[in-house]
Amino acid sequence: MRIGHGYDVHRFGEGDFITLGGVRIPHKFGLVAHSDGDVLLHALSDALLGAVALGDIGKHFPDTDPTFKGADSRALLRHVMSLVRGKGYAVGNVDATIIAQAPKMAPHIQSMRERIAEDLGVELDQVNVKATTTEKLGFTGREEGIAVHAVALLVKA
């Protein structure tokens, strides 16, 4: 059994939607990023990579590489899962916490879970996503960006 933790942050910038967990969510801002800015999938990818001691997404998908400009984070997550499987592991479960004052995540959580489960090749009950605010404290509370913590439990395949 292996455990990994991931954390990622993206700041808000120009745009009228964000993508989290592969779900496009209307918002008054977009997220600034080299890829599509899916901070949830980035944190989850880091948790998975960490659990098998393969570094982080910056190592595998550097923001200095134009190949990954605007990249679909779901495709990146699927690649990460192929690396996890290549090391002889399968997902036991994953759990993520989105930290954001806005937009409201509750209406989108189920769709996020479904997409993540599909990309990981696991059952829905192996994926949990939840959201919280910081009661208007800190950079997320001031609506300057979004942060996500994720953990992954891997088992021998």
Swiss-Prot record:
InterPro entries: MECDP_synthase (IPR003526), MECDP_synthase_CS (IPR020555), MECDP_synthase_sf (IPR036571). It catalyses: 4-CDP-2-C-methyl-D-erythritol 2-phosphate = 2-C-methyl-D-erythritol 2,4-cyclic diphosphate + CMP. One of its GO terms (molecular function) is metal ion binding. The record marks H34, T133 as: Transition state stabilizer. It holds the Pfam family YgbB. Transmembrane segments: none annotated. Pathway: Isoprenoid biosynthesis; isopentenyl diphosphate biosynthesis via DXP pathway; isopentenyl diphosphate from 1-deoxy-D-xylulose 5-phosphate: step 4/6. Its cofactor is a divalent metal cation. It is an enzyme of class 4 (lyase). Its EC number is 4.6.1.12. A divalent metal cation binds at D8, H10, H42. 4-CDP-2-C-methyl-D-erythritol 2-phosphate binds at residues 8-10, 34-35, 56-58, 61-65, 100-106, 132-135, 139, 142. Binds 1 divalent metal cation per subunit. Homotrimer. NCBIfam families: ispF (TIGR00151). HAMAP family: IspF. Involved in the biosynthesis of isopentenyl diphosphate (IPP) and dimethylallyl diphosphate (DMAPP), two major building blocks of isoprenoid compounds. Catalyzes the conversion of 4-diphosphocytidyl-2-C-methyl-D-erythritol 2-phosphate (CDP-ME2P) to 2-C-methyl-D-erythritol 2,4-cyclodiphosphate (ME-CPP) with a corresponding release of cytidine 5-monophosphate (CMP). This is 2-C-methyl-D-erythritol 2,4-cyclodiphosphate synthase. The lineage of its organism: Bacteria, Pseudomonadati, Pseudomonadota, Gammaproteobacteria, Pseudomonadales.
